Design a protein with these regions (language model features):
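N-terminal Sec-pathway targeting helices
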Residues: 1-12, 20
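N-terminal capping segments
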Residues: 22-139
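...with weaker cross-activation on analogous glycine-rich loops/strands in unrelated enzymes
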Residues: 54, 115-193
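Low-complexity, Gly/Ser/Thr/Pro-rich intrinsically disordered linker/tail segments
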Residues: 182-216
Length: 216
């Protein structure tokens, strides 16, 4: 009887480990369905920073989706080039790549801002290769250079695909798809165990500290 119990326990443990192994660094790119049946007009920016014929708002959203579609694995690393180039990344890289391909090079922009306004940032030694990949620095940068929007999630019409949302220690891009309450999903990269890159998390978070739009 003891042998049977041990065998059953071993099988159960193996099953749990297998599930965990399948979840680790296997974040899904499958997009959730838009569940909102109401009508919220989409916002389109009047700016096209990179001159590609696509407005900033649409560009940022499309680029965020294109970036996570490459299925980056979660790991915090330092890069001499600033932008990750090896298939790894963190939450700030979703935003950095989304903006870079829309005409906004955060590496250059944040570094220039830190050097011009050091009093805004709590940084002893600026480092262009990493400063733009820190949430706290992006919070300062966007607060001064982006369009500030509401942090009230219930004002659903003011949350638009391509917006930027900052939490206390996390950042993401607002999706153009919404849950049944009209609250948009978030495109983000939080940890190696994350089930999907696009998730219904906005209503569940109590630590929203910023909501921005790159241009109007």
């Amino acid at each position: 009887m003891l042998c049977v119990s041990l065998a059953a326990g071993a099988i159960l443990l193996c099953g749990v480990l297998l599930v965990l192994l399948m979840r680790y660094q296997h974040t899904s790119t499958v997009r959730p369905q838009d569940q909102y049946v109401g009508q919220i007009p989409d916002f389109y920016s009047t700016v096209d920073a990179d001159g590609d014929g696509v407005d900033d708002q649409t560009d940022v959203l499309d680029n965020a989706l294109a970036y996570v579609d490459t299925r980056p694995k979660y790991k915090s690393r330092y890069y001499q080039t600033g932008y990750p180039d090896d298939g790894y990344g963190v939450c700030t890289d979703v935003v950095a790549f989304a903006l870079k391909n829309a005409g906004y090079d955060l590496q250059a922009l944040v570094d220039a801002d830190i050097r011009e306004h050091p009093q805004w940032y709590d940084i002893r030694q600026p480092d262009a290769n990493i400063d733009f990949r820190r949430v706290r620095n992006l919070k300062v940068f966007f607060a001064h250079h982006a369009v500030v929007r509401t942090t009230d999630v219930s004002r659903t019409e003011e949350w638009q695909g391509g917006d930027l949302v900052i939490f206390e220690n996390h950042i993401g891009i607002v999706s153009d798809r919404r849950n049944k309450n009209g609250v948009p999903y978030i495109i983000h990269h939080n940890d190696p165990w994350q089930a999907a890159y696009e998730q219904d998390i906005l209503e569940k978070r109590t630590d929203i500290v910023g909501h921005y739009r790159i241009s109007e």
